[in-house]
Amino acid sequence: MDNSLKTSVMIIEDDRDFRELLEGIFERSELFDLVGSFNSVEAYGAEMLKNKPYVSWLPQLLVVDVMSSKDPRQESASFISALRSEGLRFATLFVSSMDFGALLRVLRKSHPHGWSSLQKTSRLTEQDIVEAAVSAFNELRSI
């Protein structure tokens, strides 16, 4: 399939095993084009600063572990929300071992569309991940 027809995706995940699992899922998918993978929001931010204009570098979808910062006092949701507040437009799929429905409700107050979330559990399937990614992207695209 022509990559120009696929949704571009980047991953920010500090757990190497889970990051590799996500990379495999998005590489195998006919719907997505994996264009980057990072082990922390700091690594993502550093790479982003090297790639101006940001709007042409950003993917259409970011898959982000909520706690993927190297600083335990930080979390990635604030970083992602700040990027959106600057007018950057991309869908976001949050993944975490925590249940964070309340966090999504807060994020939706300032940026209502393009969010999805998944809780990391032993029952999480490849289909669950792809469906949540598609849902986040379609929600943002529909506005």
Can you say where each PLM-predicted feature lies in the sequence?
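The C-terminal output helix
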Residues: 127, 131-143
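Conserved phosphotransfer microenvironments
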Residues: 41, 57-86, 99
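A short, hydrophobic beta-strand element within the central beta-sheet of small alpha/beta folds
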Residues: 62, 81, 88-107, 118-119
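Short, aromatic/basic amphipathic alpha-helical patches
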Residues: 22-26, 79, 104-110
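Two-component/phosphorelay signaling modules centered on CheY-like receiver
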Residues: 7, 16-42
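Short, glycine/charged-rich "phosphate-handling" switch motifs in NTP-dependent
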Residues: 115
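Short alpha-helical segment
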Residues: 41-50
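Conserved acidic carboxylate
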Residues: 13
